[in-house]
């Protein structure tokens, strides 16, 4: 399984390099709905645009909740304070993807292999980042599309 995961990472890096995409966020993703391993890559510009759009939308409902005196409701519409982790809004979605067997049931060892493979590829991902100090790596977990995230700086 580790070799398959590493192949997906390598393919994503190849695609990003061939398209001259500076990597701001690199997400190794397990598609829980149709068993597959995939990579999504975001740029700083795309992330900022997504955050701005999210915050514009959220502000409407935040304001309504505050006007209604609903603090619990307002808390649901807090602003994003920095970076998008919404994989579907990334610059490159499913840039490299490999389907797994339809009956595949991931266990803790699978999710550990995801993280370990991405940690092992940190230097390669960093080499394609426009700014390694702001590079973020992400990985899916058993229950979350984005469960872990870390920086290399």
What residue ranges belong to the model's regions?
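Short, hydrophobic-rich beta-strand element in sensory/regulatory alpha-beta domains
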Residues: 24-27
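Acidic, proline/glycine-rich low-complexity IDRs
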Residues: 6, 10-18, 22, 33, ...
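Short beta-strand micro-motifs enriched in acidic
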Residues: 29-31
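Polybasic, proline/glycine-rich intrinsically disordered low-complexity segments
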Residues: 47-115, 122-124
């Amino acid at each position: 399984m580790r070799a398959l995961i590493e192949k997906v990472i390598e393919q994503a890096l190849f695609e990003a390099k061939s398209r001259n995409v500076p990597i701001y966020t690199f997400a190794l993703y397990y598609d829980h709905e149709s068993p597959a391993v995939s990579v999504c890559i975001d740029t700083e510009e795309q992330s900022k645009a997504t955050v701005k759009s999210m915050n514009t939308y959220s502000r409407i409902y935040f304001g309504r909740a505050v006007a209604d005196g609903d603090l619990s409701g307002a808390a649901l519409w807090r602003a994003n304070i920095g970076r998008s982790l919404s994989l579907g809004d990334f610059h490159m979605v499913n840039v490299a993807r490999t389907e797994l067997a339809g009956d595949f049931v991931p266990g803790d060892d699978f999710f550990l292999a995801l993280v370990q493979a991405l940690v092992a590829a940190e230097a390669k991902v960093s080499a394609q980042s426009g700014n390694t100090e702001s590079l973020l790596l992400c990985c899916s977990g058993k229950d979350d599309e984005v469960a872990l995230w870390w920086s290399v700086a």
